[in-house]
Amino acid sequence: MRHLNTFFRASPTPPINFVTIPSMKKWVSGLFAVFFLAGCTAHRIFYFPDSKLYVDPDKLGLAYEVVTYPSLNGKQLVGVYFKAEGPAVGTVVHCHGNAHNVSDHFPLALFLRKGGFDVLCFDYQGFGASEGRPSPEGTVEDAVASVRYASARLAPGARGVVLFGQSLGVAVAVGAAVREPSVKALVLEGGFNSYRVITRTVLRRSWILWPVSAILPPILVRKTWDPDKIVAEISPRPLLFIHGTADRVVPAVLTERLSARARDPKELWLIPGAGHLQCHRVAGAAYEEKIIDFYRRALGLTENN
């Protein structure tokens, strides 16, 4: 069995950070950097990948399989596949956020496996050991390829594939579900409704970039990437929106807006006091039970099966 240490490096590549320019002397150079990005892809704005092994699944006592398969453009993706404890009722495909890599999210597999689900955690192109470079369109294609891979290896008797998107992965999961009708249900945590809105929100946190916060998003970001433009197309498949009310990275109101654009069946669960992607830590067992129950109901399962 291939170990993750053969795929991941010991330390990450430092991410680009445009909001820590230390002095007024660099104000002009900071603006030049931003306007330079206007001529580039969204890669430098939204994505901060690295190849560090954050969590070793061996230390969690998790048996796993390192898997590789092609994305829709032929680039090789690397993922980690966890088997359910007991017979699997379905497979959860996890779409992570815009930073680090797949190894930062393995703890989620613990409760999902106990709930009867196989779990596929994969890296977008350019993250971890996956080939290529990420983009809004490309991450969706990577998720579609991952859903198809998971569908092809469903356990006997399993009811189907469901998606779990977190942070930027919410936009990815929404796009993938629209393109891949085999997806049975989605849990969407800590996401945003619009790439332009979240870009503007982040720019306004910096006094250097605030003056261009209204100008740059329309230049840098296409509306066609926005999940709120397509989320209604997922119906009648069920959606569970989750967000922490104390999220200072992605404001909870953005999930509320995305939920408002979705059609039924849908649920919105706001968790008081939870920060960005801290809902599991704050809500604990209630979080685990809510998600497992939601997925099981979406797959047509009852307490007796």
Predicted regions located by residue number:
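Catalytic histidine neighborhood in serine/cysteine hydrolases
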Residues: S259-L277
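Catalytic active-site module of serine/aspartate enzymes centered on a nucleophile-bearing elbow/loop
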Residues: A283-N305
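An N-terminal hydrophobic leader/cap segment in hydrolases
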Residues: F35-P70
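Conserved alpha/beta-hydrolase "acid-adjacent" motif
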Residues: R248-L254
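Membrane-embedded segments
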Residues: L72-Y149
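Short beta-strand/loop motif that positions the catalytic acidic residue
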Residues: I234-S235, L240-H243, D247
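Alpha/beta-hydrolase fold nucleophile elbow
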Residues: A155-S167
